[in-house]
Each structure stands twice: as structure tokens, then as C-alpha cells.
Amino acid sequence: TALALTAAGALWCSARAVGVLAGADSGPVWSIPGTLFGGDTGSMDGLSALFVVIISVGAVAAVLYSRGYLAHCLAEKSPAHISLHYTALVAMFYAMLGVVLSDGGFSFLFFWELMTVASFLLILFDAQRREVRRAALSYLIMMHIGFVLLVIGFVRLDAACGAATFGALGDYFRTQPGLPLLLVFLAGFGMKAGLFAICLLYTSPS
């Protein structure tokens, strides 16, 4: 099931991405009329299309590889445990797609949080080990510190420009002092990217 869901999404998104890379107009991927930050859309341009292809290929490869990698765990873990792991893996794939396709802050933050929760569940695969539980909890705390910083950044952007979209960032930096917002976003994204050593202290070994 995980392979089918991942492959279906990968094929559909990759086909659309190849069209965009070839010069076709993809149109909106989604459009939400009213959210916390106003209207919100998702779209695919050349850069996001490239990332969609990379994510899709990587996700299908990860699911295929996991079948052999987890084979020895089938006798040790319950079917529900294995199902939860694959659910998190599929959710991670679609969350990453959502992140690169989001134009607005609301949808971006939604998929960013989904990516965090999915990663948390994946880290917890060997939850019977104390060090794994500690790593997962540390990861969750650090990611939510970063999430709060991103929310602050988008709220500031919305207050200054009337829109919390990536397109509004250009207007903001042309009309407002840019360094404070830049530092907030850098810290928020840096938590996920592992720019700070404390983010990787416990999670990387697990």
C-alpha cells in the first residue's frame, strides 16, 4: 500500500513537473480562498518542478529499499507498528511535496508541521530504546522552536505587506528593514536544516 500510494503520487507529480520543465503552464495545484493569512495557493514553477522530481524519485527508492531493510523487523514488530512506520513515510513524502509547492505561509506551515510529525514518528521506530525516545523528544522540541519562529516571520510579513506569501517577501525587503525578518527565518529554517549543532546532538545517531 505504501509503495502504491507513493508511486501514484510520484508519477502524477513527476509527469506534471516534466511538463513544467518543458515549458508548459501548470496552473494552480491548489487554491484555498480564506485562511489565517488570507487566500492561499500552491503552484509549480521550474525550481519547484525540479525538486518535485528529486523528491519523487527519492521517495519511491526509499519505500523500495525499506522493504528489504525492515524485513528482519517483521518478526519483532507488530503489524500496527510497521503500518505506522509506512504511514509516516508516505506522509513525509507528500509533506515534502507540499512544502516545495506552497506559495502561501498557511499551506507552507501546514506541510512543514506535517513533515515534522512524520519525521518524529520515523525516529521513534525503535521506541523501546531510551536513547531513541530521548532523540525523538529532543527533535520534536527543537523543530517546534523553529516552527514558532517561522510563524512569527509570516505574521510579521502579513502585518507589513497584507499577505504572508513568498511573493510578498520581495515587497517586504524593498520597503522594510530586512535584517530582523531575515534572522527570524534563518533561525526557523536552520532548526530543520541542522545549522545548529544541538539539533543533531541526539537525533543523528538514532
Question: Where would I find each of the regions flagged by the language model?
Answer:
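Short conserved micro-motifs on helix faces and helix-strand junctions that flank
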Residues: G42-D45, S56, L101, F110, ...
